Amino acid sequence: MAEGEITTFTALTERFGLPLGNYKKPKLLYCSNGGHFLRILPDGKVDGTRDRSDQHIQLQLSAEDVGEVYIKSTASGQYLAMDTNGLLYGSQLPGEECLFLERLEENHYNTYISKKHADKNWFVGLKKNGNSKLGPRTHYGQKAILFLPLPVSAD
């Protein structure tokens, strides 16, 4: 490797045609705004909870393409989705409203922008009280859009 040359894992994935697949183990998405974990309930409601033992906060992230992910609750089987009004909800089937652009920020938190509404910069976000935040009310720089992927087990 030449001096100053940088290789990333995504570049290697593309170069060698490796499958994107899923991120193997379920994760918890911890929101720095209010200390909530993103939760997708069986009835399709999306919110946050501080209860680390809640089974609906275990999320499986699977890559559709480089930087594009589906987020699915392992307990409810619902996919995180954002409708045309920017409301977060759980969907039974993966579709275009369920794809999110995942970005690692400089502060080591991740942000998730709805791919369908990427031109509007609508992020996944949680309010301090744990309610989901409407896409049009989110913007870059808010704590509400920052999520830290954590392992399910605390050990």
Curated annotation (Swiss-Prot):
Residues 127-143 are annotated as: Heparin-binding. One of its GO terms (cellular component) is nucleus. Pfam families: FGF (PF00167). The keyword Nucleus applies. GO terms for biological process: angiogenesis; branch elongation involved in ureteric bud branching; epicardial cell to mesenchymal cell transition; fibroblast growth factor receptor signaling pathway; mesonephric epithelium development; neurogenesis; positive regulation of angiogenesis; positive regulation of cell division. One of its GO terms (molecular function) is fibroblast growth factor receptor binding. PROSITE patterns: HBGF_FGF. Heparin binds at residue 33. InterPro entries: Fibroblast_GF_fam, IL1/FGF. It is found in: Secreted; Cytoplasm; Cytoplasm, Cell cortex; Cytoplasm, Cytosol. The keyword Secreted applies. Keywords: Angiogenesis, Cytoplasm, Developmental protein, Differentiation, Growth factor, Heparin-binding, Mitogen, Nucleus, Secreted. Residues 1-15 form a propeptide. Plays an important role in the regulation of cell survival, cell division, angiogenesis, cell differentiation and cell migration. Functions as a potent mitogen in vitro. Acts as a ligand for FGFR1 and integrins. Binds to FGFR1 in the presence of heparin leading to FGFR1 dimerization and activation via sequential autophosphorylation on tyrosine residues which act as docking sites for interacting proteins, leading to the activation of several signaling cascades. Binds to integrins. Belongs to the heparin-binding growth factors family. This is Fibroblast growth factor 1. It comes from Gallus gallus. The gene is FGF1.
